[in-house]
Amino acid sequence: MNEGGESFPSETVAACRMPDEKGTVLIVNGFDRVSAPLSVRADSLAGFYTDIDGGVPDRQDISFIGAQHVFDMQMAKCEVDSIALGACACDYETEVIGGNTFDYPALHGRSVAAAGYSFCSASVRAVERGEVSPDGYSAVDLILGEQRSTTIGRGVTGYAFKTFSPELQAVLRRYMAGGGALFVSGSYVATDLWTGGEASDDDRRFAEEVLHYTYDGSRAAQRGRVRVVTSHPGFSRDEYRYVNEYRPDRYRVESPDALRPAGAGAFSVMRYVENGRTAGVASEAGGTFVMGFPFESIESDVQRDRLMRDVLDFLLK
């Protein structure tokens, strides 16, 4: 607050010291994206493809009224609103749509503390710049949410919001080479490294060598349900539900990733209930657990606490 008024809310970080802690986790918020939905313009089609990437509002959106259903450029001059280029549904006309609330370290942290671990948190920029180091922490929980390489406006400034920047990759490589443990979750953890606007061979090698997964497709599921399928004794055989529809208090997960284990000892932990595609991959030898949907999108507090306990105990046993 100053003479110019009140500034916009900033990113929220959190910390907690637990008595008789099992260890200390560094929670890194790598989800700072705010953007419009994916837009496409070709010779005959143009519009917003919200089922692939519905964009990320800044906390809340009151302008979205429904998904576009007319993309045909030949309808650009049509005078009938319902069938003209850009026509969309009106089923969310009076609804508030949830977006990025920039406070996910606190939400993750509550589950970390419930599992008996202390935690600190930092922005991904602080980690990339070397202001915060993961060295000395028992594990790192990297929040990626709906982060993905995205053009801003007309795209004249290039891409922003890459999931794993070269700087972050370098930090995580060093940390994992020193025996670290890493939990990663997000909708585009594989899509962005394989088909994103800035994807490279180095990105794919990083995913395979450090994170121990490969890409098995986007838009992997529509029903918002995953089930633990591994026989590993460290994981509870539960079903989890994540937010897959528009709500005022949570962002929607419209296009989760399907993963495939990579490297010796990597295995599937979770599968999407509707089709059996892999939703979560773990590597005991590599010290990683990666999910193709965001941890914070799991609806139930009890389910989040249970999953975080299982993940940390698996990584740090």
For the regions a language model picked out, list residue spans one by one:
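Beta-strand-rich modules
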Residues: 1-4
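A structural signal for beta-strand boundary/capping segments at domain termini and interdomain linkers
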Residues: 6-10
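Extracellular ligand-binding/catalytic regions of CAZymes and related secreted enzymes
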Residues: 13-102, 114, 181, 194, ...
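Helical hinge/lid and interdomain linker segments adjacent to catalytic or ligand-binding clefts
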Residues: 69-201
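Alpha-helix initiation/capping motif
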Residues: 123-125, 130, 165, 231-235, ...
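A short acidic, often aromatic-flanked loop/helix-cap motif at beta-alpha or helix-coil junctions
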Residues: 127-133, 221-227, 277, 298
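A glycine-rich, often tryptophan-bearing local segment used as a flexible ligand/cofactor-contacting loop or short
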Residues: 147-255, 266, 273, 307
